[in-house]
């Protein structure tokens, strides 16, 4: 304790306590890299240990403070200490703290020589503008590139790191190979917490905030500068609105920001952060703090030992896991001590208390069984938490030793991923885990690492058989291989020497894992082949593989490549290569299928000496993407490990053979021709060909000591309730069943699944209500009586429990496992459970608990499909298969979990089958699948050609076709319906011994049997003997009956009557149901009307209707038959990935990888992809043709949707994603080699990131998006070929680019590609488009004449008739447009359907600005800040007219300023973009959007110009002699950009259309418009001036604008303000000036529009005629005709022109 003041002084100089700022988000990134001695407050992790907020700390420190801290450091004189003795004599946490202090002081001594270095870096001025920040920081970054790459993308160095950081970085290049591991600056750090018991008031010394001085002053100064820069940038990026209470007040935004380093920032005190509460107890008062850590308890004893709460006062204490510290530093704390220390995260305490109280309340009322179950779960969890305190392996160490003489170690903890690694104090780790340290240094110094020049890779040696087990196999424990395993090892070695890759296909339980590891060990020791060996295994067996490698081949370095992106990056940093030699560190890499596919590019880049695939039957489909990915890996030898090499067809066997030996088994057609069915002696030749490549042994042949396995099939009848439900399901689905072979497969399968559920238990069909039973006994009885199987199982388990047997119970259905678990709890039978939801360590705990010596667990509930192979439950001697699987192989695997090596008792297998049900028939048919397995693999027969089918498996889930399914469904149904409704008989009571005696029994006798007996014995289900033979003979007769004969007519009539009643109810209750449907729509359900429609029109509808009691049962899935083989979750994943790629139907392999659907065949994926695409197109078309609801705002419209199976798809969203990524898909080469050379063809603007970012990085980012999908930033980061690993997603969240910045950059780059593509296509198509244009003229001209005649002849309809006529004409126009556009465009454009039915391009961007653009706009609009503020807030007391005039003046002032701002640009694209940005900025100050404001401004400016130029227009009646300067300027503007003009009329690609329309505002007029290109002098007076070309161009202008005029028109009238009307010209006599078409140079390039309307759509507007009448100029002056009609809203025109004869045309949306 007396060293406390010393500690404080050291803390003052080191800034060490700053680690508690982890929760600020900088934990992983801003810590320094390699401080071996930074544990001044008792910490043990010193290299990336300190973790401070980089901005607040450095910005707050002045130069004088830095100098003071340096002086303090100079004064510290460390004593000499023997570190090892020091630890032995003082093993408490205080001693650890002191050792760290001494170590720190020694480091300070070494740094004195560097103190005089230059301070110029820190004096550098840090500008507040973002540009100067970036440019200067880039210079700094270049100086320190070496440090940057070591940080793994974590950003700039942090000032809170250790003193030895820079020195260590300099030493990196010179340190030897064993010390080449450097500490990361971006990972979770863990240190021993400070001695919290010493902190009385929780206040930390402010001096702790002083930053440490690195050995290099330049580094220190750079840190200062970087952090100041970040600080000022954070200030600059605040989104400040101009809306203030005092309009003209000078606010903070008007002031320039000063340099960050001149602005002192308040110091923040930093405290520890609670990560989670692990446990709670009542403990002795004061038994809290650092003395309660596990190492302090081991050293000094437990302060809580011997506490009895009844005899002495106690207090509630909580076990705390501290953020940034490993579990080894967990401490017990009270609420009081936590408050004293001012820790962060106290809200978690309240949550923990609330949860704890709820648990205690539940336990108080729970039954003893529930309490016991809860306690067991807690015990498992506690065991798991204890593992978190055990070091699994050390992966790095610091290069500098502490005062105690130990380096710090980077530790990976058991049961936790690599991302949870932490730096720990060397003295502590060496005391507790010295073995891990020895292994670590042994691995680092090992000479047995892989090297490319190993000669046996090029020339295989001669095979020498192993007569006895070599000494190197068996590990330290001296384990022995069995004889057949040694033979297997010899066979594997022989195959390798011969150059044959092979398949190890031993039956489950024979030790394929051990044989494989022994083979790798053989290569390692006999042939000095040190790897790299890749083992791809399922997740469920990965820990088993890891354990066996450690046991049998401990000399080999095996790395488990698993976890999230951070974990895998950690492995690649520390476990992959030696930093000096770049040679691989590991011999064996263990990974899973999923991780292999995620990191395909990285792992596929290595040359593997060996690839082994466990559970290789996942490769049986050669069309799956998993298969295609793995087969491309470079390997010298391949081994497939599978217990079931053949499941359904010979094609699957060929797929495996093709994978291992693609040259030898190259063609399936040749293989089928040689060994296919009908070929005499075909199988003999096949056996001979397979011999060198496939080894298959079964237990009874090789393991004579394995006890017998006896199977009994127990048949039982259904309970009365089951019979009722069974008949009810069949009756309800009568319509679907009666279709027979014309029905849908999915429909039959759904019925089948419902019947299988019914056979298992009634609760699967209709669960009971919560309060249905009064007591536990009644609930138990009802549970048992609801299933015939459970009645029998109950008797069986009671008998087995008496005998002392231990039981495995398998079911396919997880909900059935729930019911069985409930039953076992009622019976108080202790059990474990394993299904798909129980993962990783919990699964391992359950297995170990069951297999433990003296375990009291009686049952183990397992899902048939869960767990994979390799799970050993040999301590059980009884297997109950509650329901048989479609695939008999799964049941065999289930049995083998008990009947395997190590089993000492006879294994009894009881298969429960419901008599007279679909189950019985399924079982009979499924056994035929086993015959194939025997004929080919077991080599038992060579004449079974009639049985073998060589085609592909019909389905992975069910092997039956429609005819078989229909026959199975009829099985037993007739007998069932013979019992009258409501009089179903309960099954007869029978003694369990009698049942077992009568059951058919099959034993696997060791002697050879006949072929048929052997087949059935292997399958364990013999043909149904004795009492059931009659049933099988009756099957053909039963199958011939129709469902009308099976289901009684009265029951069918009753069902029809119920349906009629339901329909009538729906008709009468329609309004209420419509409301109801709205209320529940958020659940994704549908109204009952749609349900009844589907019920009558679809096969599978009727199925789902018939099985929905109490909203249970399978969901309604209408088109499920179209997507066979995909679950809803898989479809969701597919659609999510589908949206990430352009041209998704050409990128199915990438989609499958991203969606983790690599097991699916490309054919299935293509089918699903086409279903999605076509469904979206259809939904959009249906939506555009149907009437949408009016009213409501655009932003709220979700767009058309449709359903695929149970998944709702937003058609608009999917198509928009697809279209937006098309430019990327077209630009990036599909060939991988060409893709590597790709460079973006456009000039790109600078990216203001915190790292150097150039054109090459932009190109790599686009390549990454192409390969991995839009948004897959982590995958892009991990691809070494893209060189973005250290550039994107830095670990410091304050550093850019993070995901948000990458998305913005990607959008910008794709937009550039779109424009570039559009230009190229425009140039390439210019010639042909001119020819087409000439033909189009004539048609459009003819149409114009027709329209003119119609206008003349039409009389004005009554106002009341107007809307109907308008609608008719509108619909006619729209339909014409749709028909023509199909012909003129490459493909249909994706559209958003507005309420009025007019399509608007789907790719219109939302009006949002990124932060940087917003800031620029803000600065540019600062001169009109007052006008912006007043825009929406006119003075009080003004009349309506005055208010409107006020608003108009503000708008004119703002608009004129924008026009001035745009003059600095010459590029039309830039002008368009910045006009858009500035108007969007203006829109933030008013309720109008940017388009509306721009349009209103143009109206206002037009009015101003008209009033000024009215006299000029009257004096110049002839338009051809006008010399208005505006018109002259217009002609100049329109006389250039020929390529743009040519492309105007050409057939352009869809994407260009989208690109332009995304960016433009609705009200914009068009720059360099082609319609204004013709010289006015070409017109003659009178009607002759209207030549066809003139109309063609003008009408295109108007018809194209038609699409975009709809946005404003469909809004409700109250949405418009009077502002719009007042700002427009209401007088028809006003003359339009020539400058109307050119408002402030606001013209779009002629390439803006690419879609052409048909000639029927080109109608001139009545405005032209009205202007002609009102004007004193010549008849139909071209200038008058060319007024921008688009500037008037349709609403205004309908009001203005009602009195005119042609007002019908005025209302047409143009």
Curated annotation (Swiss-Prot):
Catalytic activity reported: ATP + H2O = ADP + phosphate + H(+)
This protein's UniProt keywords: ATP-binding, Chromatin regulator, Cytoplasm, Disease variant, DNA-binding, Hydrolase, Intellectual disability, Nucleotide-binding, Nucleus, Phosphoprotein, Repeat, Transcription, Transcription regulation
Pfam families: CDH1_2_SANT_HL1, CHD1-like_C, Chromo, Helicase_C, HTH_CHD1_Hrp3, SNF2-rel_dom
Binding residue positions for ATP: 506-513
Sequence repeats: 1628-1632, 1634-1638, 1640-1644
Region (3 X 5 AA repeats of H-S-D-H-R): 1628-1644
Record field: compositional bias (Low complexity): 35-63, 105-121, 152-163, 1507-1516
Modified residues annotated as Phosphothreonine in this record: 237, 250
Main location, first listed in the record: nucleus
GO molecular function: ATP binding; ATP hydrolysis activity; ATP-dependent chromatin remodeler activity; chromatin binding; DNA binding; helicase activity; histone binding; histone H3K4me3 reader activity
Skewed-composition ranges (Basic residues): 187-210, 1108-1117, 1329-1345
Biased amino acid composition, Basic and acidic residues: 1-10, 67-85, 1370-1379, 1523-1573, 1582-1670, 1690-1701
Acidic residues bias (residue ranges): 122-136, 215-226
Motif (DEAH box): 614-617
Annotated EC: 3.6.4.-
Gene3D superfamilies the UniProt entry points to: 2.40.50.40, Homeodomain-like, P-loop containing nucleotide triphosphate hydrolases, Tandem AAA-ATPase domain
Limits of the Helicase ATP-binding domain: 493-663
UniProt domain Helicase C-terminal: residue ranges: 792-943
Location of region: CHD1 helical C-terminal domain (CHCT): 1409-1511
Annotated segments matching region Disordered: 1-252, 1080-1120, 1321-1408, 1502-1710
The protein's role, per its UniProt record: ATP-dependent chromatin-remodeling factor which functions as substrate recognition component of the transcription regulatory histone acetylation (HAT) complex SAGA. Regulates polymerase II transcription. Also required for efficient transcription by RNA polymerase I, and more specifically the polymerase I transcription termination step. Regulates negatively DNA replication. Not only involved in transcription-related chromatin-remodeling, but also required to maintain a specific chromatin configuration across the genome. Is also associated with histone deacetylase (HDAC) activity.
The protein's name in its UniProt record: Chromodomain-helicase-DNA-binding protein 1
Record organism: Homo sapiens
């Amino acid at each position: 304790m007396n060293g406390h003041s010393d500690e404080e002084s050291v803390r003052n100089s080191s800034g060490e306590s700053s680690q508690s700022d982890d929760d600020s988000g900088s934990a992983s990134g801003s810590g320094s890299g390699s401080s071996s001695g930074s544990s001044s407050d008792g910490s043990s992790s010193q290299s990336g240990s300190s973790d401070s907020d980089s901005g607040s700390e450095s910005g707050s420190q002045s130069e004088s403070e830095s100098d003071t801290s340096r002086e303090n450091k100079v004064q510290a004189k460390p004593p000499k200490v023997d570190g090892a003795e020091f630890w032995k004599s003082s093993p408490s946490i205080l001693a650890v703290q002191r050792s760290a202090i001494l170590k720190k002081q020694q480091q300070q001594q070494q740094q004195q020589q560097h103190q005089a270095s230059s301070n110029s870096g820190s004096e550098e001025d840090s500008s507040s503008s973002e540009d100067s920040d970036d440019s200067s920081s880039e210079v700094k970054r270049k100086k320190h590139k070496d440090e940057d790459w070591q940080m793994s993308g974590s950003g700039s160095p942090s000032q809170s790191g250790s003193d030895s950081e820079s020195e260590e970085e300099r030493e990196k290049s010179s340190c030897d190979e064993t010390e080449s591991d450097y500490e990361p600056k971006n990972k979770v750090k863990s240190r021993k917490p400070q001695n919290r018991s010493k902190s009385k008031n929780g206040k930390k010394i402010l001096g702790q905030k002083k930053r440490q001085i690195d050995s290099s002053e330049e580094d220190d100064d750079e840190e200062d500068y970087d952090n100041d820069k970040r600080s000022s940038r954070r200030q600059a990026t605040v989104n400040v609105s101009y809306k203030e209470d005092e309009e003209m007040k000078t606010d903070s935004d008007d002031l320039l920001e000063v340099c960050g380093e001149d602005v002192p920032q308040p110091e923040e005190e930093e405290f520890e952060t609670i990560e989670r509460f692990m446990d709670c107890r009542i403990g002795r008062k004061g038994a809290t703090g650092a003395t309660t850590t596990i190492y302090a308890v081991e050293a000094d004893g437990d302060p809580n030992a011997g506490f009895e709460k009844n005899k002495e006062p106690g207090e509630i204490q909580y076990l705390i896991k501290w953020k940034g510290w490993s579990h080894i530093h967990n401490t017990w704390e009270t609420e009081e001590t936590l408050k004293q220390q001012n820790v962060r995260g106290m809200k978690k305490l309240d949550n923990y208390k609330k949860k704890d109280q709820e648990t205690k309340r539940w336990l108080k009322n729970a039954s003893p069984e529930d309490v016991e179950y809860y306690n067991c779960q807690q015990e498992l969890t506690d065991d798991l938490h204890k593992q978190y305190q055990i070091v699994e392996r050390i992966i790095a160490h610091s290069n500098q030793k502490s005062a105690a003489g130990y380096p710090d170690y980077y530790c990976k903890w058991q049961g936790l991923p690599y991302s949870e690694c932490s730096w720990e104090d060397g003295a502590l780790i060496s005391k507790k885990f010295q073995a891990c340290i020895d292994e670590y240094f042994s691995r680092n110094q090992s000479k047995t690492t892989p090297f490319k020049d190993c000669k046996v890779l090029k020339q295989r040696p001669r095979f020498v058989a192993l007569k006895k087990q070599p000494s190197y196999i068996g590990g330290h424990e001296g384990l022995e291989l069995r004889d057949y395993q040694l033979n297997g090892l010899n066979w594997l070695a022989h195959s390798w020497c011969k150059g044959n890759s092979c398949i190890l296909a031993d039956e489950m339980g024979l030790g394929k894992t051990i044989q494989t590891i022994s083979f790798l060990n053989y290569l390692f020791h006999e042939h000095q082949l040190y790897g790299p060996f890749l083992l791809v295994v399922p997740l469920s067996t990965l820990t088993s593989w890891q354990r066996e490698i450690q046991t049998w081949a401990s000399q080999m370095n095996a790395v488990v490549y698993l976890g999230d992106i951070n974990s895998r990056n950690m492995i690649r940093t520390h476990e992959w290569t030696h930093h000096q030699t770049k040679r691989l560190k590991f011999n064996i890499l263990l990974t899973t299928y999923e991780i292999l596919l995620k990191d395909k590019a990285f792992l596929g880049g290595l040359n593997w000496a060996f690839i082994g695939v466990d559970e290789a039957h996942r490769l049986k489909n050669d069309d799956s993407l998993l298969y295609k990915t793995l087969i491309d890996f470079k390997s010298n030898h391949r081994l497939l490990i599978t217990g079931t090499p053949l499941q359904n067809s010979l094609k699957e066997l060929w797929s495996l053979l093709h994978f291992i030996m693609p040259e030898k088994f190259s063609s399936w057609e040749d293989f089928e021709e040689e060994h296919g069915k009908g070929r005499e002696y075909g199988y003999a030749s096949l056996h001979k060909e397979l011999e060198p490549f496939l080894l298959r042994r079964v237990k009874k042949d090789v393991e004579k000591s394995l006890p017998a396995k006896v199977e009994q099939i127990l048949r039982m009848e259904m309970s009365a309730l089951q019979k009722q439900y069974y008949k009810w399901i069949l009756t309800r689905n009568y319509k679907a069943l009666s279709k027979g072979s014309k029905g849908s497969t999915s429909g039959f399968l759904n019925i089948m699944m419902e019947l299988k559920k019914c056979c298992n238990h009634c609760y699967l069909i209709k669960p009971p209500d919560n309060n249905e039973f009064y007591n536990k006994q009644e609930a138990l009885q009802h549970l048992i009586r609801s299933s015939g199987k459970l009645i029998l199982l109950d008797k069986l388990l009671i008998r087995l429990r008496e005998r002392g047997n231990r039981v495995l119970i398998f079911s396919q259905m997880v909900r059935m496992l729930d019911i069985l678990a409930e039953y076992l709890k009622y019976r108080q039978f202790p059990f474990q459970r394993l299904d798909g939801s129980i993962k990783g360590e919990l699964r391992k705990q359950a297995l170990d608990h069951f297999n433990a010596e003296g375990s009291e667990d009686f049952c183990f509930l397992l899902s048939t499909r869960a767990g994979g192979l390799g799970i050993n439950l040999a301590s059980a001697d009884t297997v109950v298969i509650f329901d048989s699987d479609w695939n008999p192989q799964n049941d065999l695997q289930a049995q083998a979990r008990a009947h395997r090596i190590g089993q000492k008792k006879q294994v009894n297998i009881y298969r429960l089958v419901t008599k007279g049900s679909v189950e019985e028939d399924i079982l009979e048919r499924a056994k035929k699948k086993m015959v194939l397995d025997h004929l080919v693999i077991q080599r038992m027969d060579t004449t079974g050609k009639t049985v073998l089918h060589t085609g592909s498996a019909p389905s992975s889930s069910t092997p039956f076709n429609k005819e078989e399914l229909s026959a199975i469904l009829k099985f037993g149904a007739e007998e069932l319906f013979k019992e009258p409704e409501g009089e179903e008989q309960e099954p007869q009571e029978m003694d369990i011994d009698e049942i077992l005696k009568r059951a058919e029994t099959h034993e696997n006798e060791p002697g050879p049997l006949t072929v048929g007996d052997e087949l059935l014995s292997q399958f364990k289900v013999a043909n149904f003997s004795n009492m059931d033979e009659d049933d099988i003979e009756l099957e053909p007769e039963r199958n011939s009956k129709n469902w009308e004969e099976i289901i009684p007519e009265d029951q069918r009539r009753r069902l029809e009557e119920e349906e009629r009643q339901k329909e009538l109810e729906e008709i009468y209750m329609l309004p209420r149901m419509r409301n109801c449907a709205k209320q529940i729509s958020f659940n994704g359900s549908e109204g009952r009307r749609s349900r009844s429609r589907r019920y009558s029109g679809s096969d599978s509808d009727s199925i789902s209707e018939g099985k929905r009691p109490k909203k249970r049962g399978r969901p309604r899935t209408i088109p499920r038959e179209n997507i066979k083989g995909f679950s809803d979750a898989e479809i969701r994943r597919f659609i999510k990935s589908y949206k990430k790629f352009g041209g998704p139907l050409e990128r199915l392999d990438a989609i499958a990888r991203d969606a983790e659907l690599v097991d699916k065949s490309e054919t299935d994926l293509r089918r699903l992809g086409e279903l999605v695409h076509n469904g979206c197109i259809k939904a959009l078309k249906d939506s555009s043709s149907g009437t949408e609801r009016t009213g409501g705002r655009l932003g709220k419209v979700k767009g058309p949707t449709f359903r695929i199976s149970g998944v709702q798809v937003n058609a608009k969203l999917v198509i928009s994603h697809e279209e937006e990524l098309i430019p990327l898909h077209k630009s990036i080469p599909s060939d991988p080699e060409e893709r590597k050379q790709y460079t973006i063809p456009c000039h790109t603007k600078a990216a203001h990131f915190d790292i150097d970012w150039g054109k090459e990085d932009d190109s790599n980012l686009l390549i990454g998006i192409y390969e991995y999908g839009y948004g897959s930033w982590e995958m892009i980061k991990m691809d070494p070929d893209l060189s973005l690993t250290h550039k994107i997603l830095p670990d410091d969240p304050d550093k850019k680019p993070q995901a948000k910045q990458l998305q913005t950059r990607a959008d910008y780059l794709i937009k550039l590609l779109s424009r570039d593509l559009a230009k190229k296509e425009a140039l390439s198509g210019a010639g042909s488009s001119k020819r087409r244009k000439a033909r189009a003229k004539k048609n459009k001209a003819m149409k114009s004449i027709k329209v003119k005649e119609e206008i003349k002849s039409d009389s004005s309809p009554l106002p009341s008739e107007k809307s109907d006529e308008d609608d008719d004409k509108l619909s006619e126009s729209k339909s014409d447009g749709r028909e023509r556009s199909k012909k003129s465009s490459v493909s249909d454009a994706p559209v958003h359907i507005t309420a009025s039915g007019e399509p608007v391009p789907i790719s219109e961007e939302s009006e949002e600005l990124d932060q940087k653009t917003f800031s620029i706009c803000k600065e540019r609009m600062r001169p009109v800040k007052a006008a912006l503020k007043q825009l929406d807030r006119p003075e009080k007391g003004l009349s309506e007219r005055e208010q409107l005039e006020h608003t108009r003046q503000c708008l004119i002032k703002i608009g004129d300023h924008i026009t001035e701002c745009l003059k600095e640009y010459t590029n039309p694209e830039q002008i368009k973009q910045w006009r858009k940005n500035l108007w969007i900025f203006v829109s933030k100050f008013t309720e109008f959007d940017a388009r509306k404001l721009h349009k209103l401004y143009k109206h206002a400016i037009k009015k101003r110009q008209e009033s000024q130029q009215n006299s000029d227009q009257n004096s110049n009646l002839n338009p051809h002699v006008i010399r208005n300067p505006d018109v002259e300027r217009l002609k100049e503007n329109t006389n250039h950009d020929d390529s743009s003009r040519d492309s105007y009329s050409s057939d352009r690609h869809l994407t260009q259309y989208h690109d332009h329309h995304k960016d433009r505002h609705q009200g914009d007029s068009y720059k360099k418009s082609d319609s204004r290109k013709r010289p006015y002098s070409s017109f003659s007076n009178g009607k002759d001036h209207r030549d066809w070309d003139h109309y063609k161009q003008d009408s295109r202008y108007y018809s194209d604008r038609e699409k975009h005029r709809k946005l404003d028109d469909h809004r409700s009238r109250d949405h418009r303000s009077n502002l719009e009307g007042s700002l427009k010209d209401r007088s028809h006599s006003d003359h339009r000036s020539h400058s109307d078409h050119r408002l402030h140079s606001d013209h779009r390039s002629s390439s803006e529009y690419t879609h052409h309307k048909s000639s029927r759509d080109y109608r001139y507007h009545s405005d032209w005629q009205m202007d002609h009448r009102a004007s004193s100029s010549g008849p139909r002056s071209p200038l008058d005709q060319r007024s921008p009609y688009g500037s008037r809203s349709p609403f205004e025109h309908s009001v203005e022109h009602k009195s005119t004869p042609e007002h019908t045309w005025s209302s047409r949306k143009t």
